[in-house]
């Protein structure tokens, strides 16, 4: 996949990002192109070797079809999850690291429902906040709206599904 300056992409763990520049760096005598990504949430800039962009999970923002699938995931019935906190946390961490928007939606759905039913530990609350931030950023881009509106959409879908 070829990215150009000005493209909006999604970077795993951080969500939506703008390709701010493409720079050439010399490392061990070899010139390589790097994508300079400015993450939408917070003040973070990430440099990714262009040849490894897909490998690390950099991808385009979901389209309408992808958005419909995300909403299906959010509305899906509750899935059985490990009762052991550490196993559940690790499984959710792996889903977030995958960079797959549907897996991020699963984490948001499952933690949100667990929070409604039993409450969450501090670690899971932070994870839910991070997963929501990633999902809201992508929803805002996919719907061409701001984060506040995307958050409202997410809350409505979650509330309607429970």
Swiss-Prot record:
GO biological process entries: rRNA transcription
Q: What happens when the gene is disrupted?
A: Essential for growth, it cannot be disrupted.
Its quaternary organisation is: Interacts directly with the N-terminus of the RNA polymerase subunit beta (RpoB).
The protein in question is named RNA polymerase-binding transcription factor CarD
Q: For this UniProt record, give its keywords in alphabetical order, as a comma-separated list.
A: Virulence
Which residues are listed as membrane-spanning? Answer: none
Q: Quote the Gene3D superfamilies the UniProt record gives.
A: 2.40.10.170, CarD-like, C-terminal domain (1.20.58.1290)
* Family indicated by similarity: Belongs to the CarD family.
Query: What functional role does this protein have?
Result: Controls rRNA transcription by binding to the RNA polymerase (RNAP). Required for replication and persistence during infection of mice.
Q: Which Pfam families match?
A: CarD_C (PF21095), CarD_TRCF_RID (PF02559)
Q: Which InterPro entries match?
A: CarD-like/TRCF_RID, CarD-like/TRCF_RID_sf, CarD-like_C, CarD-like_regulator, CarD_C
Does Membrane count among this protein's keywords?
no
Which branch of life, at top level? Answer: Bacteria
């Amino acid at each position: 996949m070829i990215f150009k300056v000005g493209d909006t992409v999604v970077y795993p763990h951080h969500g939506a990002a703008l390709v701010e520049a493409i720079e050439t760096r010399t490392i061990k005598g070899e010139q390589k192109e790097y994508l300079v990504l400015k993450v939408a949430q917070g003040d973070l800039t990430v440099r990714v070797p262009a040849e490894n962009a897909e490998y690390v999970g950099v991808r385009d923002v979901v389209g309408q079809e992808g958005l419909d699938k995300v909403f299906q995931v959010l509305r899906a019935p509750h899935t059985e999850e490990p009762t052991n906190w550490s196993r559940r946390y690790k499984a959710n961490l792996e889903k977030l690291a995958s960079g797959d928007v549907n897996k991020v939606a699963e984490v948001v759905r499952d933690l949100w429902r667990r929070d409604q039913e039993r409450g969450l530990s501090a670690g899971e609350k932070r994870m839910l906040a991070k997963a929501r931030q990633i999902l809201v950023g992508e929803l805002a881009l996919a719907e061409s709206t701001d984060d506040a509106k995307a958050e409202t959409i997410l809350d409505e879908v979650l509330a309607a599904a429970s």
